[in-house]
């Protein structure tokens, strides 16, 4: 009466689904279908890009993705923007271990500017890895190209001109220093993940010019 059921190859099945989504541009079609509809949003605490994603991150991201898919299926428009936390001890401590530094005086001797650039390199490196992990997880977001993030990581802190194509402008090639490009990652015109980097250019109010730019664009995007 019953036929023998073959072994369930879950990993192969997952790859087949991901390939289907990519070949048929399912996520892009969904975003096109819900564009301009009543928005639905929630505050997503950004993951710190200091190491590869852990199981606990995947657990939380699965819940977030489920909620977003549910509301998209109900015809609500979503921003679909991932965030990366780039500042604070989570990043700095890992860089201290990476460089073999154990005291504030050693960091100062190494050079604050060099230390900051090394922190940014680490963030971009692991943002690329976490992006790949999240895509593998099936997490639907407007992702940056991981290879472009790695290219920025390699050039940050130098005067080298880098080429970058934002997710929302895939046919556009932006040529600038990695520092200048990184300062604009995630802005509404470019799309892609938001990075909590700050710049050294400050306005009289004490806020960085990039933060003010993002605030202005975010307000415009939300109205």
Spans of model-derived segments:
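N-terminal, positively charged nucleic-acid-binding surface of large information/translation enzymes
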Residues: 1-223
């Amino acid at each position: 009466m019953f036929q023998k059921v073959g072994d369930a190859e879950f990993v192969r099945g997952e790859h087949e689904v991901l390939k289907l989504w990519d070949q048929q541009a399912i996520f892009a079609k969904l975003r096109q279908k819900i564009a301009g509809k009543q928005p639905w949003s929630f505050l997503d605490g950004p993951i710190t890009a200091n190491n590869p994603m852990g199981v606990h991150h995947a657990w939380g991201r699965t819940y977030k993705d489920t909620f977003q898919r549910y509301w998209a299926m109900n015809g609500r428009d979503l921003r679909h923007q991932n965030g990366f936390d780039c500042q604070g001890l989570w990043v700095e401590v890992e860089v201290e271990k990476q460089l073999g530094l154990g005291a504030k005086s050693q960091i100062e001797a190494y050079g604050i500017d060099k230390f900051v650039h090394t922190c940014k390199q680490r963030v971009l490196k692991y943002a690329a890895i976490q992006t790949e992990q999240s895509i593998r997880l099936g997490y639907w977001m407007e992702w940056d190209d991981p290879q472009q993030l790695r290219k920025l990581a390699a050039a940050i802190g130098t005067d080298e001109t880098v080429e970058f194509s934002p997710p929302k402008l895939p046919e556009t090639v932006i040529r600038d220093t990695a520092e200048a490009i990184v300062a604009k990652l995630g802005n509404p015109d470019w799309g892609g993940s938001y990075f909590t980097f700050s710049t050294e250019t400050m306005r009289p109010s004490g806020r960085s010019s990039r933060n003010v730019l993002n605030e202005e664009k975010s307000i415009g995007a939300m109205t």
